[in-house]
Amino acid sequence: MSNPRHNEREVRSPRGDELNAKSWLTEAPLRMLMNNLDPDVAERPHELVVYGGIGRAARTWDDFDRIVATLKTLNDDETLLVQSGKPVGVFRTHKDAPRVLIANSNLVPHWANWDHFNELDKKDLAMYGQMTAGSWIYIGAQGIVQGTYETFVEAGRQHYGGNLKGRWILTGGLGGMGGAQPLAAVMAGACCLAVECDETRADFRLRTRYVDEKTHSLDEALAKIDAWTKAGEAKSIALIGNAAEIFPELVKRGVKPDIVTDQTSAHDPVHGYLPLGWTVAEWRAKQENDPKAVEKVARASMKVQVQAMLDFWNAGIPTVDYGNNIRQMALEEGLENAFAFPGFVPAYIRPLFCRGIGPFRWAALSGDPEDIAKTDAKVKELLPDNKHLHNWLDMAKERIAFQGLPARICWVGLGDRHRLGLAFNEMVRNGELKAPIVIGRDHLDSGSVASPNRETEAMKDGSDAVSDWPLLNALLNTASGATWVSLHHGGGVGMGFSQHAGMVICCDGTEDADRRLERVLWNDPATGVMRHADAGYDIALDWARKQGLRLPAILGN
């Protein structure tokens, strides 16, 4: 029996200004869906896997074909509904409604666990959408680079006087998200040793210039890190190995990194974490044949790694969970103090969220890198005083290789996002850009996620697990006229631990797009300021007042 999720075909997004659909509002999701499965973008495109363990773009290849065919014929007063990667309906709406509404991996809370999801998954009744895999706005490892860079820079400010020169970061995982870490570290001025069990992933990061070197030897890796830090160089190396073995070995040797974190796919104990002592081939085979055995040994292995991270923390080394839920897995395995070290959001990122600042991103549907160069210049023009952002854009231009359609990630917030969107739309209208632009973001944003072990960890008012906020975010983006809106469960940290929403909007150069952009790109980050103001953060309260937000129960207006 053939596997409906495996096909050797190669998918790449169309380029240029010729339409394959009836309008750019349907061409945009078509191209971004296909871009998610570009072999230069996706982790395992032949299996529909984009990143993050089993984060898929469509449920089966037949469903992918149905989505593509439907988008090509969809009218501008119709909306396609996608249920866990399956196109289930087309309904008459109106021109300002989203062209696509997506719900992925959502389960009633009592059943929201990996065991139940995996049962549904085997029957082709569900699909894990991760965050940007099933919402068709993944742009490769660049999508997380700036957030990781901001995290490392803030860690440098807090712990090392704002200077990471001559220091190094230990981490694990070089997948779709973790692959950003070495480059982000180097951009922040540090060296990086990244442990990765799957050599093909390390090779992918080498090919796309996200990591500088590769080795199979821990001794060689440490020697290079030592030489680079002494010389004040910022370079990175991938070590082929198992983080659950390497981290404890470094503790045993008394090696002291300057920062420790991890971005293995620990959120998925079957498909995301190599058990200690296993080969990758053995692991892949047993994922299908004996997933319970894989999960049992993988969880025990995570406990070993987290214990090593605790040892680093107790030695005074800044250590953070980078949002893969590895502490939770270790806690469930009996490591009672697994949460002694913090997550990266409460440690370094939350003040940005309080101002609605997060991972704003855009992609050039033309496929021409020059369109991104022009939009980069426009960002600098509109935000002339943000030198930190200018520095990021300069480094991104120099260091980041585009994957698939050219794209840019750029952390900006409430008050700036809508200005950039309107400017990009004007550039499309006057012909400065060769084709429309799509603007989206990660689901990891200030108002679009409830994830008590990651984005909403340790909220000031204890509202970590309240998931009304991402639901309201999705509803508001739908009402505001985003081109497509998504609502997912389990991204980043796994089943039962998160709910989150995404949006993408197309700049097609029309005046209708101006109105939609102004609404969506104001309202979307404003929900983040609202959420944090409601939790009692002074930064958010002040920003809400400054931006004139009307928050009756919060500001009394």
UniProtKB/Swiss-Prot annotation:
GO cellular component, one term: cytoplasm
SUPFAM superfamilies for the chain: Urocanase (SSF111326)
Cofactor binding, per record: Binds 1 NAD(+) per subunit.
Matches recorded under InterPro entries: Urocanase (IPR055351), Urocanase-like (IPR023637), Urocanase_C (IPR035401), Urocanase_central_sf (IPR038364), Urocanase_CS (IPR023636), Urocanase_N (IPR035400), Urocanase_Rossmann-like (IPR035085), Urocanase_sf (IPR036190)
Catalyzed reactions: 4-imidazolone-5-propanoate = trans-urocanate + H2O
Keywords: Cytoplasm, Histidine metabolism, Lyase, NAD
Pfam families, per database record: Urocanase (PF01175), Urocanase_C (PF17392), Urocanase_N (PF17391)
Main location: cytoplasm
Keyword NAD: yes
Role noted for this protein: Catalyzes the conversion of urocanate to 4-imidazolone-5-propionate.
PANTHER family found in the cross-reference section: UROCANATE HYDRATASE
Name assigned to this protein: Urocanate hydratase
Organism: Brucella canis (strain ATCC 23365 / NCTC 10854 / RM-666)
